């Protein structure tokens, strides 16, 4: 119901949960959806940092400001830290890039993960066989059906 109204007002539905006028997309969120790195600052903040060797580290800061400050003054305000296993990278990558209606270039996979296109080919083939991703695949993008069933499309890469 709201989509036609937004479209008539000049908005484009560029992200699964985001609309904007041309040239006015949220650059902050695009960093996430393109599986880029970001550094946490402040209580409850999260980081995704890729090291030179390709290791992807996720961190979460303490949630409550008092706890965050107490830990930051002592040593570190990091409440949780984990390395994203290679087996998780395909899902994390697709969870993010497929949120964008235009998807992402194929080379972004090797640029932002330790995976190759061959590593995720079984998932791509399954998504294509279900009509969720196009054939041939020139970008990581969904078909209209894949967009309508985005969670199902992303789940294939779990």
Where are these regions (language model features)?
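Short secondary-structure transition/capping segments
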Residues: 25-29, 130-131, 148
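A short, conserved structural fragment
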Residues: 15, 128-138
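C-terminal scaffold of the Radical SAM
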Residues: 1-115
């Amino acid at each position: 119901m709201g989509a036609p109204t937004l479209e008539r007002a000049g908005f484009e539905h560029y992200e699964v949960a985001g609309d904007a006028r041309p040239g006015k997309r949220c650059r902050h969120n695009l960093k996430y959806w393109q599986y880029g790195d970001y550094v946490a600052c402040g209580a409850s903040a999260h980081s995704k940092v890729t090291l030179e060797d390709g290791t992807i580290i996720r961190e979460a800061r303490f949630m409550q400001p008092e706890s965050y400050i107490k830990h930051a003054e002592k040593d570190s305000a990091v409440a949780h830290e984990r390395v994203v296993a290679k087996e998780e990278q395909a899902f994390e990558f697709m969870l993010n890039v497929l949120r964008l209606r235009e998807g992402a270039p194929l080379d972004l996979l090797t640029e932002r993960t330790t995976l190759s296109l061959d590593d995720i080919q079984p998932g791509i083939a399954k998504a294509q066989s279900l009509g969720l991703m196009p054939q041939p695949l020139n970008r990581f993008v969904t078909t209209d059906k894949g967009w309508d069933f985005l969670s199902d499309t992303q789940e294939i890469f779990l």
